[in-house]
Amino acid sequence: MTDEEVLSEFRASEALLEGHFMLSSGRHSGHYLQCARVLMNPERAGRLAMALAQKLPRELRGEIDVVVSPAMGGLIIGHEMGRALGKDAIFLERPDGEFHLRRGFRLEPGAKVLMVEDVVTTGLSSREAIEAVKREGGEVVAEVSLVDRSAGEADLGVPYYALVEINFPTFANGEVPEGLARIPVTKPGSRAK
């Protein structure tokens, strides 16, 4: 799947939003990718997951024991990656602000884990999720996401593969351009309060 084909899937599902958004990373942006919309169609979600699975080197695909994704954003694409790879897919939750496995999910000691996210911007959530997998006894061997918004700068400490790289400018508090600052802020991400 080419970058343009991926973006076409986002446009077709009205998943590319414009406005003033506070991202989960705490940074501001004039654009937001609502991956839940692009993944709401099971056929589209399956196509995207198959294309994402093909980004992984063959030897790495053979190494994976289980797919883990952080709730909420990673749930659907994580499940579809499990299907694409023929592996179980489980997820992490933040009941107290820190990621944990719940609902009877567990990892076998030393399990080789593929971490799956919808979007990576700074990599903070990914690093927290990877740390949670370590606490649970697993080893993250790679991470994948539908979208890399980090401009290739996210250091996750593991090999990282994205289906597409999209570089919308983001701004720290106090650095938001005047035109963007005039638009009311929406907090659509997983850390929205």
Swiss-Prot record:
Gene Ontology biological process terms, A to Z: 'de novo' UMP biosynthetic process; pyrimidine nucleobase biosynthetic process
Residues that, per the record, bind 5-phospho-alpha-D-ribose 1-diphosphate: 117-125
Pathway as given in its UniProt record: Pyrimidine metabolism; UMP biosynthesis via de novo pathway; UMP from orotate: step 1/2
Classification via PROSITE patterns: PUR_PYR_PR_TRANSFER
Keyword Glycosyltransferase: yes
MF-aspect GO terms: magnesium ion binding; orotate phosphoribosyltransferase activity
EC number annotated for this UniProt entry: 2.4.2.10
Domain of life: Bacteria
InterPro entries documented for this protein: OPRT, Orotate_PRibTrfase_bac, PRibTrfase_dom, PRTase-like
Cofactor(s) demanded: Mg(2+)
Residues noted as binding orotate in the record, renumbered to the chain: 121, 149
Enzyme class: transferase
Pfam families referenced in this protein's UniProt entry, alphabetically: Pribosyltran (PF00156)
Catalytic activity: orotidine 5'-phosphate + diphosphate = orotate + 5-phospho-alpha-D-ribose 1-diphosphate
Keywords: Glycosyltransferase, Magnesium, Pyrimidine biosynthesis, Transferase
Protein purpose: Catalyzes the transfer of a ribosyl phosphate group from 5-phosphoribose 1-diphosphate to orotate, leading to the formation of orotidine monophosphate (OMP).
Protein family per UniProt: Belongs to the purine/pyrimidine phosphoribosyltransferase family. PyrE subfamily.
Subunit relationships: Homodimer.
Protein known as: Orotate phosphoribosyltransferase
Name of the gene this protein is made from: pyrE
